[in-house]
């Protein structure tokens, strides 16, 4: 079993909980309230800005031209594919470009992005990959599962979201990261692998916190 496959196996209970979250299920059956999705898209827009920064940092940390090129492609896809989807949904939801740029991060968004940036800046290229991979990989899995629900990808509002994350193009992004992880992890000690596992499982859990934040439209638990 490859190292990435072993991480995938250990993360399955977390990812299953994410897929079964009422936010995700609401996208699948079309019942999710628009206000919850709007909250999600605003916070996810902020998230993607920092996610793009992580890919830019990956380009800097790359040890060879191929790695640098791969992270450059991931950066481009985030800025010009995922964020375009968010801007298109924002327009449909009546959110102006100015409003998008002025969004304040919720506590969960801040915790999630700060954790990844801290790991990536202080750690190695492998640490960075372990931090960003759960988002891309689990989103593709969710997209494929939701696409398997009859009529889900044809939904007039949520269908485009499902189709993007279930696409072959998005799978390619996840595959690049998986392949890099396995290649870079060759020869690591058990201790080094355990560190990467902790990072991978932590960001997997933070993904679920993000779904829950959006479903409850929660900025902060305490606003005093």
UniProtKB/Swiss-Prot annotation:
Name the catalytic site residues.
135, 207
Transmembrane annotation, as ranges:
none
> Does the record's keyword annotation contain Transit peptide?
no
Domain of life where this protein originates: Bacteria
For this record, an example GO cellular component is: cytosol
For the ligand (substrate), the binding residues are 44, 139, 165
Checking SUPFAM superfamilies in the record gives: Heme oxygenase-like
An example GO biological process term is:
thiamine biosynthetic process
The EC designation for this entry is 3.5.99.2
- GO MF, one example: thiaminase activity
Q: Which PANTHER family match?
A: BIFUNCTIONAL TH2 PROTEIN, SI:CH1073-67J19.1-RELATED
What is the recorded function of this protein according to its Swiss-Prot or TrEMBL entry?
Answer: Catalyzes an amino-pyrimidine hydrolysis reaction at the C5' of the pyrimidine moiety of thiamine compounds, a reaction that is part of a thiamine salvage pathway. Thus, catalyzes the conversion of 4-amino-5-aminomethyl-2-methylpyrimidine to 4-amino-5-hydroxymethyl-2-methylpyrimidine (HMP). To a lesser extent, is also able to catalyze the hydrolytic cleavage of thiamine; however, this thiaminase activity is unlikely to be physiologically relevant.
**What protein family does this chain belong to?**
Belongs to the TenA family.
Q: Subunit structure of this entry?
A: Homotetramer.
Which named protein is this? Aminopyrimidine aminohydrolase
- Recorded source organism is Halalkalibacterium halodurans (strain ATCC BAA-125 / DSM 18197 / FERM 7344 / JCM 9153 / C-125)
Q: What is the lineage of its organism?
A: Bacteria, Bacillati, Bacillota, Bacilli, Bacillales
């Amino acid at each position: 079993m490859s190292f990435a496959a072993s991480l995938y196996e250990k993360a399955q209970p977390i990812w299953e909980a994410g897929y079964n979250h009422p936010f995700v299920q609401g996208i699948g059956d079309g019942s999710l309230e628009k206000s919850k999705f709007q909250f999600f898209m605003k916070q996810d827009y902020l998230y993607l800005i920092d996610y793009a920064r992580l890919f830019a940092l990956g380009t800097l940390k790359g040890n060879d031209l191929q790695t640098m090129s791969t992270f450059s492609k991931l950066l481009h896809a985030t800025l010009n594919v995922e964020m375009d989807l968010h801007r298109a949904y924002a327009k449909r939801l009546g959110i102006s470009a100015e409003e998008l740029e002025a969004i304040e991060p919720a506590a969960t968004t801040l915790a999630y992005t700060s954790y990844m940036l801290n790991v990536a800046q202080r750690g190695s290229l492998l640490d960075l990959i372990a931090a960003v991979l759960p988002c891309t990989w689990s989103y593709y899995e969710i997209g494929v599962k939701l696409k398997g629900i009859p009529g889900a990808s044809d939904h007039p509002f949520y269908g485009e979201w499902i189709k993007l994350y279930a696409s072959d193009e998005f799978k390619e992004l996840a595959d690049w990261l998986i392949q890099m992880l396995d290649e870079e992890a060759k020869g690591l000690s058990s201790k080094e692998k355990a560190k990467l596992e902790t990072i991978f499982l932590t960001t997997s859990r933070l993904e679920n916190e993000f779904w829950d934040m959006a479903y409850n439209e929660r900025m902060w638990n305490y606003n005093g």
